[in-house]
C-alpha cells in the first residue's frame, strides 16, 4: 500500500473519483501527499489519487497539525499504530486510537 504497486488500482480510483460529486469541506482536511489543505474538488480528487501510491508523509502531517494548534490526534479504524507514532513524534501531543466501543468511551473521556 502507498507504493508504485498501487498505480493500477489508483487509476481505477481516479475514474471513480471523477464520477464522484465532492462538496467543499466544512473543516480543513490535511492530505498526506502534499501535507496541504485543499478546498477545490479537483485538487482533492488529485490528492486522493496520488495518496494511493505516494509515500505517506506522516511526520510532516503531524507537525503541520501541531502548527495549526492541534494537540489531540484520534486514529479511527482498526489498530493503533498511528496513535503510537504521534507520541513518538512529539511527546507533548496526545494520540489515541478509536476502534471499538471501549475505546470510543476512552476517547470521549479524553476529549471531555
Model-found features: residue ranges?
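Acyltransferase
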Residues: 1-76, 80-82, 105
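Short acidic, glycine/proline-enriched helix-loop-strand junctions
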Residues: 82-105
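Short, hinge-like loop/turn segments at secondary-structure boundaries
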Residues: 8-13, 91-93, 112
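Cysteine-dependent PTP/DSP-like catalytic domain, specifically the C-terminal lobe
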Residues: 106-111
Amino acid at each position: 500500500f502507498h507504493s508504485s504497486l498501487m498505480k493500477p488500482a489508483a487509476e481505477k480510483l481516479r475514474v471513480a473519483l471523477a464520477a464522484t460529486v465532492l462538496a467543499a469541506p466544512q473543516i480543513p482536511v490535511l492530505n498526506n501527499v502534499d501535507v496541504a489543505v485543499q478546498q477545490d474538488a479537483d485538487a482533492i480528487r488529485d490528492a486522493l489519487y496520488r495518496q494511493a501510491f505516494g509515500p505517506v508523509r506522516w511526520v510532516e502531517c503531524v507537525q503541520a497539525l501541531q502548527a495549526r494548534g492541534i494537540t489531540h490526534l484520534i486514529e479511527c479504524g482498526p489498530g493503533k499504530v498511528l496513535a503510537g507514532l504521534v507520541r513518538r513524534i512529539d511527546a507533548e501531543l496526545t494520540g489515541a486510537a478509536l476502534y471499538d466501543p471501549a475505546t470510543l468511551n476512552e476517547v470521549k473521556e479524553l476529549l471531555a
